Every structure is written in structure tokens, then in C-alpha cells.
Amino acid sequence: MSRALRLLPALLLACSSSGPTPTTPAPPPPAAAPAATPAPVPKASPVAAVPEASVPVPEASPAVAPRGPIELTFVGDIIFGRYRGDNTFDPIPGPDDHPFADIADTMRSDLLVGNLETPLTYDLPLKSPIGAQFRFGASKQMAAHLVDGGFTALSLANNHAFDLRAQGMIDSPVILRELGLVPLGAARTEAPLFRVETIERSGWKVGFLAVTARRNAPHFDGTPELPFASTNDFDALLSPVIAAARAQHDLIIVFVHWGEEYADDPAPHQRRAAKALLDHGADLVVGHHPHVLQGIERHGRGAVAYSLGNFLFENTNDIPRLTGVLRARFTAERCLETLTFHPAYIKRTPSKHPVPATGGMGKQVRARMTELSAPLATSFELQGENLTLGSFPCTPATAL
């Protein structure tokens, strides 16, 4: 049963409403930020959607067998500032700040993915171009912090994509590519709307499907369109895309912007949708939008993390500042071996930034994740400061 959190001050009401075959990817991200900009990661290759409503899950048969295990890490919502009530922009990191430096070791893995809850542009306007209460934006210079943080890819499919109007939707994926990062779920004018982007790393082909069930503006003809769908339509619209991409990838990860803000629990229709996506071939479903942590649920050979909460965000009040880094380790046979949740929180000084949660703060983060996962029939093992899930079945759908 959903238990709504007490809404905090005004800020807690925040969001309302491809190409050719990839080249050799960059080496893993550096040990700490700031760091030199790594070599560009490969461009993602889209896989077109198919019209069938139901497609059997085929055996995966990649062209190149994986050379060993792979680790993927995921974080929640990231912004670099917002427009205040007087319509002036208030940045989060200062010009000399390195917002991901304190948590770089925790985030380090083969692939690092987050939700970029802000559009990007080359010339950030002094005044917001829209009239909403909560308006985000960032320049290319601000987005360079993502490179220092070791990110591989960022999802753009969320309900702040229109905060800088159509120009921000156009500039965002271009800027990410210029920085050597892979945009996921970017708004586009050409079909297919829902597509799997392929990232190759260390002999693995990992497919990412990013979609949003929330948006802050309707689509107008001739303008870029977000990969938007109602959660109730996920099975019909997304499951065929996943099933079609399954044979071309070692792993399929679904990154989804959904749910209710500040809710403790996912809604029943979210749970049904997530399980359908896993049944059709997804290995993980990773959610965001509620701005708070929600529970993790096992299903078959995979799992769903309903919300990873905020990560780099201005809201440092009570529950919304609790966050974490989710690490998934897959064996060479393409089976989920362990899922580890590293507790973290948003520190207020010297500027807002995520740090590992240890001691009393770590207990607070772990308690929330444990409590909210229990009704989902999930129990963790405590390993140091972290929560771990293991013993996932390895079925023929993912075995080599």
C-alpha cells in the first residue's frame, strides 16, 4: 500500500506535471574527479521498434562473446541548477567545484548511467523561457562535470526535457555526444520513437531503452518528440521492442521516468509494467522521477529498482537527500550475479553534492531501502555499509 511522504516546503513539489556501428569504447573512468576527459565512448546504435504486440523472447546470440563479467552502475536524478522565483539562474556546483569527486570510487564501473533531469544548451539564458515554477537548465560547461564523474550515458527522457523549449531538446543530445557521452531517450523527429541504443564495452553489447511516462509539454508537429508512453501502455509498446532487440544484445536495460513524486511505494500498475518488461527480455528496469528512494523487487532472472531518488539535486531536506548507487554485476554467461545498493546522501556544504553514506547516515539510508523493499518480498544481505541481493536464476533466455 502506498504511503505518501509528508510534502516538504515548496521545493519538494518539484517536477509536476545513432548511427553506424560503434567504434572501440573508452577505458573505464578515472579513479577520482576532477580527471582528464577520457577518449570518447562509442556512439550508440539504434535498434528499430517492431509493430507486433507480442513477440517471443529469442535466445541471445551476440556476434562477439563476452570476455568476462561486467559491472553496470546507476544513479538517479541529476541537475546543475534551477531558475528561482525572480527568474534568475541559481547554479548548484560553483565554478571550482567537482560535484562527483567524493563518490567517484563508488560509481566506478564498466558503464555508469544516470537520469539527466535538465536540458542542455550552449548559451544558457539569463531568464527562463517557460513560466513553470520549477525550471532547470545547464550549459555545456556545466555538463562537463558528467565527464569528470565517469559517466557513460545519460537519459534525457523525463518531464523537464522542455524546460529550455525545443532548442534545449535539440541541443542536449548533441552536447552529450560532443562530450563523449551517450544520450538515451533523446527527443527526435524521426521514427522509431522507442529505440534500443547499443553500447559496446569489453566484448559486451548492452542495449538501453529509455522512456518517460511523464512530460512537461505536449508534442507539437515538427518539433522533437520524447519517447513518452503511459505506464499502462508499456507492455504493448515496449515489450515488442525489447523482444526484437534481445537477440542482438548481451543485456537489455530499461531506464524509465515514472511514478508519483515523494511516494514511498510504486503503484500496482508500475509493478505490472516492470514485470512485463522483464518477462519480454529486459535484464533490469531502473526507475526515477519520485525524487525519493523506493524499493527494489526481484522478478524471474532480473530485478526492478523503482526509484533511485535524487543524486545531484538542490533538495537536501530530510528524505529526498537520501540516495544511493546501484551496482549490477553480470557473469560471463550474461546472468545477473549480484545487485548491490551503495547508500549515499546529498551533502549540503560547501555546495550540494552526493557522498557515500556511512555511520548513522548509512543506517538511515539502509533502513529506508530495507523497509520499502520488504513488501516487495525483497530481503538484503548486509555487506559492510552496502545492501546486496544475489542468487538470481540463470535461465536459457540469457545464457550463452
Identify the meaning behind each predicted range:
Residues 16-30, 34-400:
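Acidic, metal/ion-coordinating pockets
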Residues 2-10:
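Sec-dependent signal peptide recognition
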